[in-house]
């Protein structure tokens, strides 16, 4: 998973951009980047590896040196971005969120349409964001390019694009990932996570529909590409990926998890009789709270996540490392475990990594 944030302001926007991007750190731990535009300096950009260093620490120096009124940034679990592009459409910076399943097919198509090379490689593959930019630049306008890419991509793709005039943002064709617009006096922003602008004094302004394309500057925004009718948002945003304070399509993540726990409790009524209900941190906690609230079974925390250093266990790229993180990040409270019947709720049981390591 990845996340992005963009802002246009009458004042310098780098502080808002810095913290807005940082609020997406739960969505990725490999790469991060920021790009800004100022009339005096033009485009400037910074990209860093954040696998072993948090975003704020890595980008603190860049944030103090950059300046501009418009900017975009991203946390990426795959390719380095944003990318700076010079083309017949003008100069722009671009960041994407999603997964292109027909990547190789589209690379071949770009070659056939006249592009002779790609510059960016990530893990032996052509950078997906550069691929998107190459496809866009075969058309006569940015909007036409975005629509063209949306029609070709199999998988998911949301786009954020920075120009000297303002920001373009396009939600995935089927709305699989969210895009929210925030607004305050003299500034507007776009974000994957709705809560990312709450502490920056922005207020909820608009949520893009599937395939919708939106343009904004510091003063105003407008839809330039109408939304589609079909919505297939990723349900795992509520179950796992999303931060508890996030809201997608009017449904808050924490509230949804509590209600899921309540539904589990209704299913179990009269069948199980635990001493306490508990969740595997972090995203399992609200499920357990919902279960406890409905059944009146005490909610306890027999496993505590060591939050200062351990990331979410889905983030490492190899399974061995995932297993290690899953094992090391949770510390048991034996007083709350020994001789007790626990009902333990976990949302990550595809591979059984978390639940197996925890219960053993």
Can you say where each PLM-predicted feature lies in the sequence?
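Conserved short alpha-helical segments that host acidic/polar catalytic motifs at enzyme active sites
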Residues: 1-209, 215-275, 280
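Feature captures the catalytic cores and cofactor-binding loops of soluble hydro-lyases/lyases
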Residues: 60, 64, 86, 289, ...
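Gly/Ser/Thr-rich loops at beta-strand to alpha-helix junctions
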Residues: 99-100, 280-287, 350-352
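Generic, well-ordered alpha-helical scaffold segments in large soluble proteins
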Residues: 109, 113, 135, 152, ...
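Alpha-helix capping and helix-loop boundary segments enriched in small/acidic/polar residues
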Residues: 123, 251, 255, 317, ...
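Phosphate/diphosphate-binding loops
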Residues: 196, 203, 208-212, 266-269, ...
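Hydrophobic alpha-helical segments characteristic of transmembrane helices
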Residues: 246, 271-301
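Short, glycine/charge-rich flexible loops or terminal/linker lids adjacent to PRPP-binding catalytic cores
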Residues: 296-343, 352-357
């Amino acid at each position: 998973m990845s996340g992005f944030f963009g802002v246009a302001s009458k004042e310098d926007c780098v502080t808002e951009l810095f913290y807005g991007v940082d609020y997406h750190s739960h969505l990725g731990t490999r790469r991060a980047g920021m790009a800004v535009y100022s009339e005096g300096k033009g485009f400037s950009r910074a990209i860093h590896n954040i696998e072993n260093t948090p975003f704020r620490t890595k980008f603190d120096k860049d944030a103090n040196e950059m300046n501009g009124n418009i900017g975009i940034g991203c946390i990426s679990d795959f390719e380095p971005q944003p990318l700076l592009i010079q083309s017949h459409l003008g100069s722009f910076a671009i960041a994407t969120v999603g997964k292109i399943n027909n990547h190789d097919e589209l690379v071949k198509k770009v070659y056939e349409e006249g592009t002779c090379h790609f510059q960016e490689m990530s893990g032996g593959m052509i950078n997906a964001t550069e691929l998107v930019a190459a496809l866009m630049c075969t058309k006569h306008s940015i909007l036409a390019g975005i629509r063209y890419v949306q029609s070709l991509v199999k998988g998911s793709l949301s786009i954020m694009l920075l120009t000297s005039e303002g920001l373009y943002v396009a939600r995935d064709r089927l709305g699989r990932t969210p895009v929210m617009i925030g607004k305050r006096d003299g500034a507007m922003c776009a974000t994957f996570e709705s809560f990312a602008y709450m502490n920056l004094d922005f207020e909820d302004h608009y949520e893009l529909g599937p395939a919708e394309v939106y343009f904004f500057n510091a003063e105003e925004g407008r839809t330039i590409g109408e939304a589609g009718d079909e919505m297939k948002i990723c349900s795992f945003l509520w179950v796992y990926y999303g931060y508890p304070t996030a809201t997608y399509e009017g449904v808050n993540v924490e509230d949804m998890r509590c209600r899921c726990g309540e539904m589990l409790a209704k299913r179990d009524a009269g069948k199980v009789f635990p001493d306490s209900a508990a969740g595997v941190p972090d995203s399992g906690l609200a499920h357990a709270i919902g279960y406890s609230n409905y059944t009146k079974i005490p909610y306890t925390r027999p496993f505590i996540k060591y939050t200062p250093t351990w990331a979410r266990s889905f983030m490492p790229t190899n399974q061995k490392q995932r297993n290690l993180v899953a094992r090391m990040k949770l510390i048991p409270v034996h007083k709350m475990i020994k001789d007790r019947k626990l009902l333990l709720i976990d949302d990550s049981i595809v591979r059984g990594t978390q639940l197996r390591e925890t219960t053993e």
